[in-house]
Amino acid sequence: MGREIDEELIITPPELTRTIETAPAYSEELLKTATDKNYKLKTLRRDKQQAEADSKKNDRYDGQLKASRVDMQLADVSTEEEKVNIANDLKKKLDAINTAAAEYQNKKDANSKAKIEWEQQQKSAKLGLVSAVELQALELQYEQTEMELSAAAYAYDLAWEEYNMLMNGTTLDIYDVYKSKLS
């Protein structure tokens, strides 16, 4: 698991020319897909089955039978709580995708506008209508919008990756704690 400490970390830049997709609409079918693959729910179901099996054994004392029934009730409550958590996480991930998609589109538009403006000012500079300092300022502004576009593309890709991980049943607990400490 993981990688060697001295292994080179390869980061591939996002594709900036792709079409921007919005997230699918929240539905019960989408929630069912997410809950079917969730490992916590599978664990809770297994715990309940174990408690049911323990409660059916004839060699148990009254206290042990009550404990098994309490374990079954606890598993039921925990299962419902986890389903609510998954539904809330799914809604958050879908909102994050749509927010990142809108931001990405805004940055694409701003970048194309800055590029056109910079190219026009380069032509004006050749004619002597714009000073070298003004041209450098516009170039810097254009490069700034390119950086913002790249950051928006990474955020968009990350939002989709988080959604895909949730839908595949991958837990994001450690990642969410790390992300919350960064912000």
Each language-model region and where it sits:
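Amphipathic alpha-helical coiled-coil segments
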Residues: 44, 68, 75, 79, ...
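Amphipathic alpha-helical coiled-coil scaffold segments and their short linker/junction regions
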Residues: 1-66, 174-183
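Generic structural signal for well-ordered, non-membrane alpha-helices
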Residues: 46-49, 53, 70-73, 77, ...
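Acidic, low-complexity, intrinsically disordered peripheral segments
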Residues: 79, 150-183
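Short, charge-rich amphipathic alpha-helices with coiled-coil/heptad character
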Residues: 79-87
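Charged, solvent-exposed structural "stalk/scaffold" segments
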Residues: 102-150, 154, 164-165, 171
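Alpha-helical heptad-repeat coiled-coil segments that mediate oligomerization/polymerization in large
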Residues: 86, 93, 128-131
